[in-house]
């Protein structure tokens, strides 16, 4: 089954397979299946065409997923950078945005360590 350009793995249960879509986690997958009146234990390969269409239409109408969601997220970050707010400046400087410390740690955001030579002691 294919939703929003993503092939869902046929051997997985529907609840797990939906999490392969960017923007859909376990909780949202459960809600979607409940709204579409599908069993979470149903395997993707066992879903018939009618159920598949119902699921696809529900997801596309109700939620932003995959490239649409990524585009909205990147536009939100770009907007923050354009208006020059604190969060935008942190994004632009590639520093942690949510108040994490940077004196130590923050290696994920800042990249590999760049060693700076210490001061020489006078003798």
UniProtKB/Swiss-Prot annotation:
Ranges of compositional bias, category Basic residues: 100-123
Example GO BP: translation
Pfam families assigned: Ribosomal_S13
Record-linked SUPFAM superfamilies: S13-like H2TH domain
Entry-linked PROSITE patterns: RIBOSOMAL_S13_1 (PS00646), RIBOSOMAL_S13_2 (PS50159)
GO cellular component: chloroplast; cytosol; small ribosomal subunit
InterPro entries membership: Rbsml_uS13_C, Ribosomal_uS13, Ribosomal_uS13-like_H2TH, Ribosomal_uS13_bac-type, Ribosomal_uS13_CS
Subcellular localization: Plastid, Chloroplast
Region annotated Disordered, chain positions: 99-123
Alphabetical UniProt keywords: Chloroplast, Plastid, Ribonucleoprotein, Ribosomal protein, RNA-binding, rRNA-binding
Highest rank taxon of the organism: Eukaryota
One Gene Ontology term of the molecular function aspect: rRNA binding
Oligomer and partners: Part of the 30S ribosomal subunit.
Function recorded in the entry: Located at the top of the head of the 30S subunit, it contacts several helices of the 16S rRNA.
Family: Belongs to the universal ribosomal protein uS13 family.
NCBIfam families: uS13_bact (TIGR03631)
Protein name in UniProt: Small ribosomal subunit protein uS13c
């Amino acid at each position: 089954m294919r939703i929003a350009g993503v092939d869902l793995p046929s051997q997985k249960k529907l609840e797990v397979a939906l999490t392969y879509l960017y923007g859909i986690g376990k909780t949202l997958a459960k809600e979607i299946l409940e709204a579409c009146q599908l069993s979470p234990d149903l395997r993707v390969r066992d879903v018939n065409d009618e159920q598949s269409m119902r699921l696809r239409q529900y997801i596309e109408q109700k939620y932003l997923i995959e490239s649409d969601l990524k585009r909205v997220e990147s536009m939100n970050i770009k907007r923050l950078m354009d208006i020059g707010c604190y969060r935008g400046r942190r994004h632009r400087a590639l520093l942690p945005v949510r108040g994490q410390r940077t004196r130590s740690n923050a290696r994920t955001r800042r990249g590999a360590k760049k060693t700076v030579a210490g001061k020489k002691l006078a003798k």
